[in-house]
């Protein structure tokens, strides 16, 4: 509150808590000049002292923990959260993130700190489809499947935004709407050409889920064009689909600099005044950048836009701030009471560990795992990610107070029960600089003498991530993206040298995307995909290797055998070439979508369908029994896919339509039930009629442990 006008402001109706937010927002808007309105349309919005409006920075991030705002609990990267196949767990994660975000925000207010990364509007989650493993930002997403992405994303948003009937806890932002997955180096001028079926069946469903099921309050437009229109200024995407079809009632923000791209790079218009007007008119309310604030006044003068059109955007933004409680006394906003000391608390740290454990995905095991500590005297650890904090964190991360790398976690677990030798061995990538490119003789000797060797490699966000202009351009990597999916050669050579010693070798991969192993998978005894596992990653990996935790994670992406199997990176047609993702890929996978082993075994049986013939609007139920027939307690992710058996046109090979992560003690069994409805679960998008439809004919219900490990099948018929 501004003291010089405190009494007047207290009497102002836009501070009157007895009025609804919509009325208060309209009152505030009516008092603002055009200049003041325009000033609020950038991510860095200045104060309006005469109206009691505090300055506000809209830019904040919380992809897997509160990011870039000091110490915070760091959870596994988004792709690792997807590997849990556990939406309820991810809701718990998001609740913790939003608790820490609220606590940080109110602590900042006490110190009159209104700077970037201190607000309550967060530009997370990233729900783009991880179409191609070469895309550098894929690890920010929930993987390649629209259904899984929608389920995980929905619970993440619900956890962030809270369940108070009046106030928003935070504003979550679904990004990047709507067809966006590389190349990073071309994102400011690239045009993603996409057909209507791929748009509605692959790229839009997760956004629709978050808008309709999670009531996400903000959507971010992408940098690139989609079929010729800027995604951040597309009437088709932002008005016809988002608001008219889906009923979205929040606000839209551009990606940072995307409004400038409209004239500067996409060449859709010629001037910044035109870009500013086009952005507002098509439904982009907030510009991350300064184009609106610098040029909208002139846009009005030139007759490109009216003040009334600007009012719509300003109203949406202030309504969001009202709903966050920014114009109400803190004592009546429940979320404002969250204490600062919950930040990075022990309870939150334990949830980070639990999530990391749940994300661990066992790709191969010849029986060497779990390690029996009583039968091992010496372990040789080699690899560039064994003590690499960056490999815990991914990108868009906070600062963990006590990060645990793999070698730290291993030492904590083993203690004095076995001897551990460790060497980085080689760098992640041979980048032309002086570095570690070959294993030394002393390392080879350590491996030979060991009972078991562990190579910890993969990538980190230095090599795969957001656009790196003027940055990385070496063999296999280009400005954030990968140009090849094979493991860097110096790591391959190191693993080969270790295998040649005759000592059993376990590979721990820390990465955010699929990695081809050039045949090494045949010679390795075990492979564990650990993703970027967050602040307790080292403890989680050690617990899995020694059997204290039985892994149950599943791949949210396909692992391909080689780059040569992939279609053109710039082709957004899902069925091009060999096809993108498990839904269209016709080649042989290295490890399929949904794959993940356990130390125990599960038996599926007794699949029943309550209706074999039905109409498109009739619900049907399936049930089956799953039993843990192994020697360990464990988790299994049961997966249900549906395959169209007699389509007259190209359909996905199969599509995930439900899943559940269950825990079963050894010898226990459980009956699992799912319900479906054809018009939702068996549909396709008819481009001619511009609506979802169901083909009449036969469909196969597939139940299994992965997209390729199908244990039970039944055929149903839609009349």
Feature locations, PLM:
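Extracellular/periplasmic metallocenter environments
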Residues: 690
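Short beta-strand elements
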Residues: 709-719
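Glycoside hydrolase catalytic-domain context in secreted enzymes
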Residues: 2, 6-684, 693-708
